[in-house]
UniProtKB/Swiss-Prot annotation:
Belongs to the aldehyde dehydrogenase family. AstD subfamily. It is an enzyme of class 1 (oxidoreductase). This is N-succinylglutamate 5-semialdehyde dehydrogenase. It catalyses: N-succinyl-L-glutamate 5-semialdehyde + NAD(+) + H2O = N-succinyl-L-glutamate + NADH + 2 H(+). NCBIfam families: arg_catab_astD (TIGR03240), PRK09457.1 (NF006992). InterPro entries: Ald_DH/histidinol_DH, Ald_DH_C, Ald_DH_CS_CYS, Ald_DH_CS_GLU, Ald_DH_N, Aldehyde_DH_dom, SuccinylGlu_semiald_DH_AstD. GO terms for molecular function: succinylglutamate-semialdehyde dehydrogenase activity. It comes from the Bacteria. PROSITE patterns: ALDEHYDE_DEHYDR_CYS (PS00070), ALDEHYDE_DEHYDR_GLU (PS00687).
Amino acid sequence: MTLWINGDWVTGQGALRVKRNPVSGEVLWQGNDADAAQVEQACRAARAAYPRWARLSFGDRQVRVERFAGLLESNKAELTAIIARETGKPRWEAATEVTAMINKIAISIKAYHVRTGEQRSEMPDGAASLRHRPHGVLAVFGPYNFPGHLPNGHIVPALLAGNTIIFKPSELTPWSGEAVMRLWQQAGLPPGVLNLVQGGRETGQALSALEDLDGLLFTGSANTGYQLHRQLSGQPEKILALEMGGNNPLIIDEVADIDAAVHLTIQSAFVTAGQRCTCARRLLLKSGAQGDAFLARLVAVSQRLTPGNWDDEPQPFIGGLISEQAAQQVVTAWQQLEAMGGRTLLAPRLFQAETSLLTPGIIEMTGVAGVPDEEVFGPLLRVWRCDTFDEAIRMANNTRFGLSCGLVSSEREKFDQLLLEARAGIVNWKKPLTGAASTAPFGGIGASGNHRPSAWYAADYCAWPMASLESDSLTLLAMLNPGLDFSDEV
């Protein structure tokens, strides 16, 4: 029984799904998808639970969420192992994911009060008040790269605001989704407040097509996000929050410390085996001898990166991709770029047959026409050389995406220029593109999405503002508008 609907674990009525470790092939989880009727059942449960949950005091909702935080802490080692085994990422990285889940809960609680709490301003004849109200029943679609942390960034603020939820994890990480749901169960959420439906495309389509849905919160690929946007078009009554991918540029203008810049680039491009939406996909490198030296060093250090299993010792920097198919897609993308005229500096290769272990790839595309503006979700970095900083900014903005952008330069003036001209939601200076602060907005523009699903800013789309003018008494004004006559004369 792998679905959680209205406070009960039930067996899915859809197709059988089997999840294997992407490196070892070990069977980790199996269960049946939710069919359309079960998705509808989950929605009815969420709708029935909504009025009572929304009317609870914020403190009562906060108690359940903080209890969940405590359970994350006490079950950290177990959840770390589940996430690592299911995604293929190293143990150290899965541990940081669980830590981020814990830390963002306190920030989400504070954000509710600061961004969506209640405010009152006194007026001469009364007061103006601002309150926030939950949307109702929300669907949350989770991604596979951070199957605990990123859905958590939607679920926690939504629950705190008073919404009820139907959560569909990625079909590639059902075990992590179930493990997190079991902790919510222990936290004492009332039946129907949070429901879990497992499944792939058919389950997702049934969920997003529900009429009695007040909104959908999504983190994942641009292709799926676009499909959801089309599906919900013409329905302005439903909140749609999309956090999608990016074709992110990293500009290397001047390098004082080559090794430091190489480390920043590797952290930007290859951490999580390149499976972060903020990963650098395009390296825009200044032409000249210094750029040549940097590039040679980048290749030399990158070719030493050896992917390994989640529990290898010593721990590897990168593990496997989410699946063998995902690894092969990266290799295919590299082969296509090479066929277009790209110059391979470091060829990505499958480290072991029938696994998702893939070494990083670097390919130079300077002067190659028609390079697709697509996100290759893996450890593949494309390089362009540029002569001026203005040219680098133009190249950086030459994308339909707008998630993250970074600059390595000793000149603050160039960063100030980039801040004015960059089309990206995250713009960093001498910091990896993949770094993020829980108190800062996380998200982008264009094909990268709309709202900002972080602990602090997620509060904005989990509740809507209600404005009120209020007075303790009602008396006739001494001065009336022209044309109004309240005299006693007939």
